[in-house]
Amino acid sequence: MSDSGPQLDSMGSLTMKSQLQITVISAKLKENKKNWFGPSPYVEVTVDGQSKKTEKCNNTNSPKWKQPLTVIVTPTSKLCFRVWSHQTLKSDVLLGTAGLDIYETLKSNNMKLEEVVMTLQLVGDKEPTETMGDLSVCLDGLQVEAEVVTNGETSCSESTTQNDDGCRTRDDTRVSTNGSEDPEVAASGENKRANGNNSPSLSNGGFKPSRPPRPSRPPPPTPRRPASVNGSPSTNSDSDGSSTGSLPPTNTNVNTSTSEGATSGLIIPLTISGGSGPRPLNTVSQAPLPPGWEQRVDQHGRVYYVDHVEKRTTWDRPEPLPPGWERRVDNMGRIYYVDHFTRTTTWQRPTLESVRNYEQWQLQRSQLQGAMQQFNQRFIYGNQDLFATSQNKEFDPLGPLPPGWEKRTDSNGRVYFVNHNTRITQWEDPRSQGQLNEKPLPEGWEMRFTVDGIPYFVDHNRRATTYIDPRTGKSALDNGPQIAYVRDFKAKVQYFRFWCQQLAMPQHIKITVTRKTLFEDSFQQIMSFSPQDLRRRLWVIFPGEEGLDYGGVAREWFFLLSHEVLNPMYCLFEYAGKDNYCLQINPASYINPDHLKYFRFIGRFIAMALFHGKFIDTGFSLPFYKRILNKPVGLKDLESIDPEFYNSLIWVKENNIEECGLEMYFSVDKEILGEIKSHDLKPNGGNILVTEENKEEYIRMVAEWRLSRGVEEQTQAFFEGFNEILPQQYLQYFDAKELEVLLCGMQEIDLNDWQRHAIYRHYTRTSKQIMWFWQFVKEIDNEKRMRLLQFVTGTCRLPVGGFADLMGSNGPQKFCIEKVGKENWLPRSHTCFNRLDLPPYKSYEQLKEKLLFAIEETEGFGQE
């Protein structure tokens, strides 16, 4: 009994806490050839449940931080260093780990850690024998008296056995997610040290902190559920020092007196007297605990909480339920929670923070849907104006049909052509068919187009150009229908598809992406293929889904990926205006150090959409389409981007600025991320005054600057990727609005056109299920119609010709409704064939419920 006092005093000295400053200097990491851009490493330091992180260094294998981190340690603590690589769109990757024993480091440095620089070897997480690099750190601010070492080595060796593997493995059963011990493990270890016979005798005050400790300690993580929480958990108080460790004992004599240091909020070394429990920490007054909860203190002085209702413990202080929530118990004794506002239930206990985050997510989702709906409406008028000419029956831009040909319309409203000379019919227009099936040019010849769309021919052998076609000997200037042909939009599309077929490569490529990391997976795969491979047929695979890609999966991939890459939240693009939800390049995209690589990737992706005839979810501004077409932008293009700035330039153009006394110079200011910079429109423009004579030049230059300010590098990177897949000259006979429709499709859903061009299998137009279906389509709003269209066809965009020109895996494929299944089945879709499997429901309400559930909740491919 006489030896117990000194032993406990010695352990109190060894468990006394002090600050340690760790300066993470630099690292030398092993290169990974699979990572093109290099890792973005940062260091996480964990010790005794604490976790501190450094800033990240972008794209380097030799990072330098020189960042100080302060932690609370004891002489028996063990530091764990983890080097992570930050990932933008997925979880961070662990590059290597290293451990450091403070006790051994103190012994090797004369019990003082004052600016001690150490180089630690990083090892792999899965293979500890693999060297991943070196990490340099500096330790400072810790000092221990020498008598602690001479008298306390045995206690140190015993007490440090708790965390020997805490750094080598991430799933240690005795260490929680951030390194803190469970309450039962801590209690068991403390009893062994306090009551064991091998505890050495130490003098008081052996461990002295060289710096004042921190005023508070971060809360420990949630422990495992204890074996018993009814009342005070049972503990074994035998003389051999064993303990059950189910929970920290609560029937011990706890000294609740506070010293002068405790009142100031400092951490006090634990004083154990006669086997009694530790002194609890002086906690700040908080809100009362919910009913059924109790606050306790374990033998390390750590506060934990007991839920007597659910019979569990946790380190986190419980919060009361948010307003409107109620806790209930079902017939099997399971606890669930009821939200009386939304009339929903959940197994997970809600918190104020989780409810607030959910409400914020709902608000952002509704705002995004509203923005997209406004964007969709923007294209309705444009399409009507675009096709006004093609709907004029008195004017045919292709000219008259060849002799012996006749144009007819079938019962479904589709146009076909009759050749009375050979008595055959065909869908293709003979005027465009002959132009698409021309003979190949001689070797060394190339056909190009002027700005007006007139074809001319380049003889690379003699380095000459001519309008005369070397195949026919006729001049392209004399071919009137050819010029009219390139001015008709539908014919332009056919001609463009013809050239895409000429550039296409045989076979196909597989693109495997997951929905959770769609952006990053698509970026890695598209940039890993050569441009020629990306011209092959695309075979998109979503792992875990049974869909076979006959065109429908690729359509959804383009739709989903375009929604991701063009999201303004990534700071690569921004909305063109407050009320204009078209996109343009964000001048502040440089805050992402890899933004030029992403713009090259987006250029490839947009060109792939045009090349493969797929649609994207979001469109660009008209000036950006002009840049794709290599057409100049001017003052008129500024009106759709910045109306206020446009009106001010119009005022300058129409008024005498000299009479108004305006002092303007050939210099403008721009603000990016709060920083204002001056830009000269011409050399020494800050000293050149704008006058009536040169204001036209000023207006032209300032309009060009406004449309291209700060995005020159991004635009160049975009076109580098774009031209690798599809050279821009193949688009030069389109205008900006036509290119917009070609890339995004038509936005207006014509119900009459939809119903007129639908076909049925095992149903008829008069079947009650079909009549109910069209009644349902008429009742829902425009947004749900688009979702229904996306559910069946894979995209909410329509081709140029509307529902009559819907394409499937085998060519033209109309919207089809087939009678399949039983009345208790959900509708299924076959996006590759534009087919909806509609079971024979018994009532309209049942059909409406099943269809709404299908289009709202279904995601992925599970079709045959």
Curated annotation (Swiss-Prot):
> What membrane topology was assigned to this protein in its record?
Peripheral membrane protein
Q: Which residues form the HECT domain?
A: 530-864
Entry's localization field: Cell membrane; Cytoplasm; Nucleus; Early endosome membrane
- Stretches the record annotates as MAP kinase docking site: 535-544
Q: Which UniProt keywords apply?
A: Acetylation, Antiviral defense, Apoptosis, Cell membrane, Cytoplasm, Endosome, Immunity, Innate immunity, Membrane, Nucleus, Phosphoprotein, Repeat, Transferase, Ubl conjugation, Ubl conjugation pathway
MF terms from GO for this chain are:
arrestin family protein binding; CXCR chemokine receptor binding; ligase activity; ribonucleoprotein complex binding; ubiquitin protein ligase activity; ubiquitin-like protein ligase binding; ubiquitin-ubiquitin ligase activity
**GO biological process entries:** apoptotic process; CD4-positive, alpha-beta T cell proliferation; defense response to virus; innate immune response; negative regulation of apoptotic process; negative regulation of canonical NF-kappaB signal transduction; negative regulation of CD4-positive, alpha-beta T cell proliferation; negative regulation of cytoplasmic pattern recognition receptor signaling pathway
Gene Ontology CC terms:
cell cortex; cytoplasm; cytoplasmic vesicle; cytosol; early endosome membrane; membrane; nucleoplasm; nucleus
Q: Where is the WW domain?
A: 287-320, 319-352, 399-432, 439-472
Q: Where is the composition biased (Polar residues)?
A: 151-164
Modification after translation: On T-cell activation, phosphorylation by the JNK cascade on serine and threonine residues surrounding the PRR domain accelerates the ubiquitination and degradation of JUN and JUNB. The increased ITCH catalytic activity due to phosphorylation by JNK1 may occur due to a conformational change disrupting the interaction between the PRR/WW motifs domain and the HECT domain and, thus exposing the HECT domain. Phosphorylation by FYN reduces interaction with JUNB and negatively controls JUN ubiquitination and degradation.
What is the superkingdom listed in this entry's lineage?
A: Eukaryota
Q: Give the Phosphoserine positions (modified residues).
A: S199, S232, S411
Q: Which reaction does it catalyse?
A: S-ubiquitinyl-[E2 ubiquitin-conjugating enzyme]-L-cysteine + [acceptor protein]-L-lysine = [E2 ubiquitin-conjugating enzyme]-L-cysteine + N(6)-ubiquitinyl-[acceptor protein]-L-lysine
InterPro entries the record matches = C2_dom (IPR000008), C2_domain_sf (IPR035892), E3_ub_ligase_SMURF1 (IPR024928), E3_ubiq-protein_ligase (IPR050409), HECT_dom (IPR000569), Hect_E3_ubiquitin_ligase (IPR035983), WW_dom (IPR001202), WW_dom_sf (IPR036020)
Report activity regulation. Answer: Activated by NDFIP1- and NDFIP2-binding. Activated by PI4K2A-binding. Inhibited by DTX3L-binding. Inhibited by N4BP1 binding.
Does the keyword Signal belong to this entry? Answer: no
Checking Pfam families in the record gives: C2, HECT, WW
Composition bias of kind Basic and acidic residues appears in 165-174
Reproduce the free-text note on domains from the UniProt record: The WW domains mediate interaction with PPxY motif-containing proteins.
Q: What is this protein called?
A: E3 ubiquitin-protein ligase Itchy
Query: What is the species of this protein?
Result: Mus musculus (Mouse)
Coding gene?
Itch
